[in-house]
Amino acid sequence: MLTNDQLAQWDRETFLHPSTHLAQHARGEAQGRIMVTGEGCHVTDRDGNRLLDAFAGLYCVNIGYGRQEVAEAIATQARELAYYHAYVGHGTEASITLAKMVLDRAPEHMAKVYFGLGGSDANETNVKLVWYVNNVLGRPEKKKIVSRMRGYHGSGLISGSLTGLPLFHAKFDLPLDRILHTEAPYFYRRPDTGMDEAAFVAHCAAELEALIDREGADTIAAFIAEPMLGTGGIVPPPAGYWEAITPILEKHDILLIADEVVTGFGRLGSMWGSDHYGLKPDIMTIAKGLTSAYAPLSGTIVSEKVWQALEKGTDENGVMGHGWTYSAHPIGAAAGVANLKLLDELGLVANARETGA
């Protein structure tokens, strides 16, 4: 049996960890932890420490650890059909069922869902679809994406550029061109402590308007935002923020991408953060709570308006050349189906609303 010391040595010698001080970890200076089991809201490491996982992994294990129903669904799918791709119209019962379940829970104006693996790749997909749509609609100059400082949207080339945290840009030559950032609705960090919430909301709206005027509305394709800031502070927007922002987007024909990776599937006491704040997004990013992290899966939900442009594009140009090998992976989809069933059966969305958790 492997000892803790042997595993720790292998870890230092072989494993390049995400978001880690790599040199300190390799030298054994940064404390690591080797996890073994999880049950409910607790996890246990190899040293026998039982820990309250108040962060739910990376705010993703919405149904808690150790749900056997999801484990059995994964095992059954792996035994029956461990993999098949989703290219050129192929599907599985799990992927088709999950698509239906997601759209049944999505806002009424949403039309289709595309499945990937994680929130980062979903936001890469979102931006590609926005660019594709504007090319189809004869607006090749309308390609810039406005994100927000302190926002988090992943760590890929596009998604890392969308992220508004310097750590994810440093030494990576990010953000890329076409990605712009505006004020975050973080009241505590307001530029003038004399501002009340109403004044700060007006400031955020004015900053967005000024950016649009400076760049040209005809060059800006979309605005991406988490309904409530996640990694940037887990901070709700001040009262009236979204009511001030959405009319600006509508006036300038700028699509709204709601990044629901964290806020989706009940985290705010409603199925979507967009529901909580009364938003009507054109595209929604989903991941984390889609499977409660029992298997990797993400999604891009597109509105009827976006879908019509995608449909037009393929009628005019043929197959749309976008996809991942593991798009709609059947094991991930099976986990998603079982997870959403549990979310309903256990009343977890209502419980979050009632307890304020």
Can you describe what each PLM-predicted range is?
Residues 1-357:
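Conserved N-terminal phosphate-binding loop of PLP-dependent enzymes in the Aspartate aminotransferase
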